[in-house]
From Swiss-Prot:
Originating species: Synechococcus sp. (strain CC9605)
Keywords, comma-separated and alphabetical: ATP-binding, Ligase, Nucleotide-binding, Protein biosynthesis
EC number: 6.3.5.-
Name of the molecule in the record: Aspartyl/glutamyl-tRNA(Asn/Gln) amidotransferase subunit C
Subunit structure: Heterotrimer of A, B and C subunits.
Length: 97
């Protein structure tokens, strides 16, 4: 794997819009190099026959089943409104003509 230079770290910091102090460049260069070496090791792992996944632990949906539920009678609901007009709620006007 290629060596990471200080200029590479500066470029990544600039692309990420990070204000990276000059005295930290050497530290981050070494850390980034270590990360890339680890990624190189991961690329060598034999994953033949391993199913693809998006997470380490399988997640299942725990919500209730969607089904038809009884509802209140329309007239009972409309009767609770401060104002109504036929089968609709009447609300104050909020937009000008």
């Amino acid at each position: 794997m290629s060596q990471i230079s200080s200029d590479d770290v500066r470029k990544v910091a600039q692309l990420a819009r990070l204000d990276l102090p000059e005295d930290k460049i050497a530290t981050y260069t070494g850390q980034l190099e270590s990360i890339l070496e680890y990624v190189g090791q991961l690329q060598q792992v034999d994953t033949e026959g391993v199913p693809e996944t998006t997470r380490a632990v399988e997640v299942t949906n725990v919500t209730r089943v969607d089904g038809v539920q009884p509802t209140a009678v329309r007239e009972d609901i409309l009767d609770q409104a401060p104002q109504r007009e036929g089968d609709f709620f009447r609300v104050p006007k909020i937009l000008a003509d």
